[in-house]
Amino acid sequence: MIQDLILLKAKGNKLSQENYYEVVDYMIKHGADKLIAKFFIALDSFGMSKEEVYRLALAMRDSGRVLKFNMPLFEKHSTGGVGDPTSIVLIPLIASLGYKIIKMTARSLVFTNGSADRFKAIPHFKVMLTNEEIEHNLNTTNACVISHGGDMCPADRVLYDIMEKYGLEHNLNLLVASIACKKFASGAKIVLVDVKYGDASVIKRYLDALSMAKILKYVFKKNGIKPILTISSTVQTFGDGIGNAIELVDALNVLQGRKCLLRDVSVRFAVEMITTANPTLDRSDAYDMINSNIDNGLAYKKFMEIVSAQGGDTKILQEAKVFKPYRSVNFVADRDGYVGSINSLVLGEIVRRICETSHDDNIGIALRVKIGDFIKKGEILLSFYYKDESDFDNYITAISGCIRITNEKIKEIYPIRKVIR
């Protein structure tokens, strides 16, 4: 049966909704075996229409539990970048404004860490919840963070395995289907997806990010979801930290009032979301409301409520003990000049590689500079937090070459290039 579908695609045919339900049924029964891998390789080779992407997403949604709540829900997703904990800022920020927001976390592809990785740095934080628990949290705290694991979209986890094993992580149609099935299952009605492009992203080119955003717009609208697609560059990391616990600290600092790029981007995302929900709301008023809830502490208080409701240890957050590095070393500038580039791709790969082998959320890198900053010889460029001496020995050379100093100032780049609705 799967072989027949492969032949149909090879002949240029579009597959029906029934065909995609058959594919997903096979995925659930057989996992990521060679035959189903050949099918997805065929999709990669021969292409998919937007309608087919929607059909695959719908079939994967129906492979597991689908949430249905009688309430308007926001959700936010990122296609994956380095040093981007905006979701952790955005969830309590939106909730503090009286809106309801759900976040389905998932493990990330390739070199980035996902929201699931960051939240698990909070001791005892529970993301495997029943429908009743999810609804209760949405009604009491306006927010809920849930896992893509368990019985939510199990077919998508098979697709993840295939994409990683066979190098299909860059296929825009499969990426969209993977994202969309989870948003369909979460019950969200307004979804912001930050589509990233650049060296430190799965998607490398701006035009590919634009194409992906257009496919997302189609499948979301067909499912009755209001889409907000931001296209952003990974040239500059949003936050200063790279690593699970350190990115969590980054987000907490913003929720406690710190002014920085991470705050600017998070506030911009929040503005796009609440003005989509309320088209008559003036954007300047939206900015004022959102910034006020950071500065008056309501967003931070809401974060603690959300963590507490999901069993997380709020004391360790309040005492700033969530990030407990073992050893650290500073990398300094060898001359005066301007920060010309930061290779966050390599830095992200290093941190993830060590985290996966050590199973330690305290591994990380703190960037002390941004692109365009003027620095003097001897100033700290970044700090590397590690556990074993072998980690330092293995990566010192690679890390030391990740920040380039130039004689001329590089023009500051605001990362968000475009917004599509």
Residue ranges and their predicted role:
Residues 1-83, 96, 121-122, 302-309, ...:
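Acidic, glycine/proline-rich low-complexity segments that act as flexible tails and inter-domain linkers
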Residues 4, 9, 14-16, 67, ...:
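Well-ordered secondary-structure scaffolds
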Residues 40-44, 118-120, 156-165, 194-203, ...:
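Active-site-proximal beta-alpha loop/turn segments in soluble metabolic enzymes
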Residues 45, 89-101, 182-187, 222-223, ...:
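Alpha-helix C-terminal capping segments
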Residues 72-95, 99-111:
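Glycine/serine-rich anion-binding loops at beta->alpha junctions
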Residues 75, 101-105, 127-130, 145-148, ...:
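General beta-strand structural signal in soluble alpha/beta enzymes
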Residues 118-144, 214-220, 224:
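A glycine-rich helix N-cap at a beta->alpha junction
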Residues 139-189:
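Phosphate/diphosphate-binding glycine-rich loops and adjacent basic-rich segments that engage nucleotide
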